[in-house]
Swiss-Prot record:
S-adenosyl-L-methionine binds at G209, E210, S241, S263, L264, H265, N340. HAMAP family: RNA_methyltr_RlmN. Belongs to the radical SAM superfamily. RlmN family. [4Fe-4S] cluster binds at C145, C149, C152. The keyword Phosphoprotein does not apply. GO terms for molecular function: 4 iron, 4 sulfur cluster binding; metal ion binding; rRNA (adenine(2503)-C2-)-methyltransferase activity; rRNA binding; tRNA (adenine(37)-C2)-methyltransferase activity; tRNA binding. It catalyses: adenosine(2503) in 23S rRNA + 2 reduced [2Fe-2S]-[ferredoxin] + 2 S-adenosyl-L-methionine = 2-methyladenosine(2503) in 23S rRNA + 5'-deoxyadenosine + L-methionine + 2 oxidized [2Fe-2S]-[ferredoxin] + S-adenosyl-L-homocysteine; adenosine(37) in tRNA + 2 reduced [2Fe-2S]-[ferredoxin] + 2 S-adenosyl-L-methionine = 2-methyladenosine(37) in tRNA + 5'-deoxyadenosine + L-methionine + 2 oxidized [2Fe-2S]-[ferredoxin] + S-adenosyl-L-homocysteine. This is Dual-specificity RNA methyltransferase RlmN. Signal peptide: none annotated. Its cofactor is [4Fe-4S] cluster.
Length: 411
């Protein structure tokens, strides 16, 4: 039995108006800023330049080690400076609209972010998967997706917009809030908190959207997440999954340096063109070449290839043989993913016996090929099942919202 908590209380129309008025007075968030951006913002707000380096160090600790979401909780910063920071900036969390808890302990959150420009509030989903000895947070990078992979529920939701680095990090910060994963108020100020005992030990960019179509914001967020003076997640515990945006794959290794996962799902171009349509732009030969050239690739830093098992589509032993041949010489792990059904799909999951035969062949060829245990299926939190109700604003709605904002500004 799954548990669902609907955390909304406002009428949608009233909430839209409230967000529209708030956007007129929106303050920039310090969350998601690089140190250089934060320095410029603090100087512009009136912080003396000689103090900036110290203030950044203090803020970084409070935001990313202690996880505070209110300037008033920053106890080693003067009351006057806290008031000035609150006047110019925000560090607020997104609204948690709904929290669902699966029978297996998986948690899915629906987060709502305020509008940007003439947009509307948007919603995205994040998923926490607890396992023995580790806990993985699956993070979204876009609202919706452009890729329309035919087996993926998210692909049925048109792209609304990219998420900012703040919104990407906010998923991690809010999840840690909900799980009690930040230190309590009795922890001494300035203390670095050990990683042992953390509920979130790994993050995967495998939620809604294609991360490499939002490269700069994803890069900024992941560099902050892996910063040793803050959230301090090892880059070996951060995995970025792409459907194959070839030009950005090398940049991912060179500029971010995290683990790479490829949503492969087919070993023949004619089939992958259907399952993962970006293959028409970047076919298998180009994708595999980019993987072979991934910076830092080694047995200690393998690429994960994700392969959803679709009955009578891509699950034959011939497919397994072609898969081994395709990846020959690449340090790799192959995750076999039983297809997770969603409303309206025409695909079926491969029979378990067939999945095991496929896995046995790949294993015998020297590639680790674990069969992923489906998690959170009962709350549509499993791989390929995420989707929110956010849509791109129609022109008539955009004009109405702009009028509402103008009216609000005149109050």
């Amino acid at each position: 039995m799954s548990i669902s908590f609907d955390l909304t209380i406002d009428d949608t129309r009233d909430q839209l108006a409230r967000h529209a008025r708030a956007s007129l007075e929106a303050k920039p968030s310090l969350i998601g800023m690089s140190r250089e951006e934060m320095a410029a913002a603090l100087i512009a707000a009136g912080v003396p330049e000689r103090q900036v380096k110290m203030r950044i160090s203090q803020l970084w600790h409070w935001l990313y080690v202690r996880g505070v979401s209110d300037f008033a909780d920053m106890r080693n910063i003067s009351k006057d400076l806290r008031a000035m920071l609150a006047q110019h900036f925000t560090i607020a969390r997104p609204e948690v609209v709904e929290e669902q808890i699966s029978q297996d302990g998986t948690r899915k959150w629906l987060f709502r972010f305020p509008p940007r420009s003439a947009g509307r509030p948007v919603e995205i989903e994040s998923v926490y998967i607890p396992e023995e000895g580790r806990g993985t947070l699956c993070i979204s990078s876009q609202v919706g997706c452009t890729l329309t992979c035919s087996f993926c529920h998210t692909g049925t939701q048109k792209l609304v917009r990219n998420l900012t680095s703040e919104e990407i990090l906010a998923q991690l910060l809010t999840a840690r809030d909900r799980l009690g994963d930040f230190p309590d108020k009795d922890t001494p100020d300035g203390a670095m908190v050990p990683a042992e005992g953390r509920k979130i030990t790994n993050i995967v960019m495998m939620g809604m959207g294609e991360p490499l179509y939002n490269f700069e914001e994803v890069k900024k967020a992941l560099l902050i997440a892996s910063d040793g003076d803050g959230l301090s997640l090892s880059k070996r515990r951060i995995t970025l999954s792409t459907s194959g945006v070839v030009p950005e794959i090398y940049r991912t290794g060179d500029e971010i340096g995290v683990m790479l996962a490829i949503s492969l799902h087919a070993v023949r171009d004619e089939l992958r063109d259907i399952l993962v349509p970006i293959n028409k732009k970047y076919p298998l030969a180009e994708l595999i070449k980019a993987c072979r050239e991934y910076p830092g690739l080694s047995n200690a830093k393998r690429i994960t290839f994700e392969y959803v098992m679709l009955k009578d589509i891509n699950d034959s032993l011939d497919d397994a043989k072609l898969l081994v041949k395709l990846l020959q010489g690449i340090p790799a792990k192959i995750n076999l993913i039983p297809f997770n059904p969603w409303p309206g799909t025409n695909y079926q999951c491969s029979d378990w016996e067939q999945i095991e035969k496929f896995a046995d062949y790949v294993n015998a060829a020297g590639y680790a090929s674990p069969i992923r245990t489906p998690r959170g299926r009962d709350i549509l939190a499993a791989c390929g099942q995420l989707k929110s109700e956010s849509e791109r604003l129609r022109k008539s709605e955009r004009l109405a919202l702009e009028a509402m904002m103008i009216a609000g500004h005149g109050e």
